[in-house]
Amino acid sequence: LLTEPQTPPQLATERYSPKLAKADVQALAQCARQHRTTLATLLSVGWALCLRRLTGNDDVVFALVVSGRDSRIPGIDRAVGSYAGIVPRRVSIDPAASLARLIADAEAASIRQADYETSALNDAIRSLPGNELPFDTLLSITNFPRSNPIGPIQLQDVRVDNHNALPLNIIADIGEEIAFHAYFDQSRLPPETTRGVVDMFADVLRTIAGEADQQVQALAGPALPVLTPLPNPEHPHHAIHRHALRSPDQIALRFGEVVVRYGDLDRRARMLAAELSG
């Protein structure tokens, strides 16, 4: 599914609106009430099940966007500005367990993780071996109230583009229906594959709404190893360092009359890395 990354990435956006109709969302909300959880938790479980099918792994990790608006802070719902952050969400899936058990475990994990929603992602990554991101997909769940306008100001035809270094970002916009937006690097993920992944996500959510008492392996189907890791991908800084050793005087960057050669670029990068990690 994923191919070797290119430089620069070929960013693209696909919009799916809606994929879950009003009746499906109502069934999903009823499931959330029955299991004393939230729609956001059910969507997280659904995305974890998708990743299981795509990777063939029962232990998956993805990036989850959190609001950063702790309900324990008075007046936080009226505060202006973005407090959003990203946390790694790890889901361990027991194929023999019921989906209800998986939902309960996910809700408990969400509660435990609430105290870390304002933590810096970089701090968490620095504690990992090799400072590597433990995920390559991101899920963002938006649930803004639409029935209570504030003041006379109205916004129309608003478009927001979101891009980052991850090859696939899914935004689920919850209203009476659930619309899906996919932001992806099409040099690594073809558009038709992205659509297939989003369709799978919607189908899994419909299944969750109607069959929460069955076993996970019966709901998600057999693991489908479609997503495969890249064969020993080389990081850009390694390539720059290797090139600097071979041709230190070759021009790496040029801006107007300013010229930076590979040897100097490598030296500056190492100094900056030492400063940031120090």
What do these predicted regions represent?
Residues 38-50, 196, 200, 271:
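Short amphipathic alpha-helical face segments that pack within enzyme cores
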Residues 39, 172-191:
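Histidine-centered acyl-transfer/condensation active-site motif
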